[in-house]
Amino acid sequence: MSIGRRLTASFAGIALTALAACDGVTGVGSRVEPALIIFYRDSSTIVAPDTVSRGEAFTVRIKTFGGGCTREAVRADVAIAGTLAEIRPFNRTQNANACTADLLFLYHTVQVRFDVGGRTVLRVMGEQRGASTGGTNGPALVERAIVVR
């Protein structure tokens, strides 16, 4: 075998080993969890217009909390019933032995449309962490009222 082929084979072996060891690249060893929407004294923000038109879609942007092993916003499920839109954001957390000690904001953007007029509610449902929950998360919700004309 020539030196070039040996080097190529060696580099290929190193690359495969590195990829197999890196869960962040392959997505193996991670879990999708309800997003953290209350972090101690801070709550997620829901950015949406104050007033919208009936039957027209509008954009809603939700700030969630991440950091450490949670570094990616994955999806947000939306369910609309009458004057209530429930939004459930989810983030990806890597399974790791060590994670960074930082706080990140992870943003979720969804489209919402109400077919009824009047006062409506955007309800974001997720998890909270704080003094009352200790080191574990508990259920949480944050709401914002808007007017549909």
Language-model regions, residue ranges each:
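Bacterial Sec-dependent N-terminal signal peptides
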Residues: 16-41
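An anionic, turn-rich surface loop/hairpin at beta-sheet edges
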Residues: 88-114
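Sec-dependent bacterial lipoprotein signal peptides
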Residues: 1-23
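Structural beta-strand segments of beta-rich domains
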Residues: 54-60
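Short acidic/polar inter-strand loop motif in beta-rich domains
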Residues: 127-141
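Aromatic/hydrophobic beta-strand junction motif of beta-rich domains
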Residues: 60-67
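Short tyrosine-centred short linear motifs in exposed loops/low-complexity segments
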Residues: 55, 116-121
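Short beta-strand segments of immunoglobulin-like
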Residues: 47-52
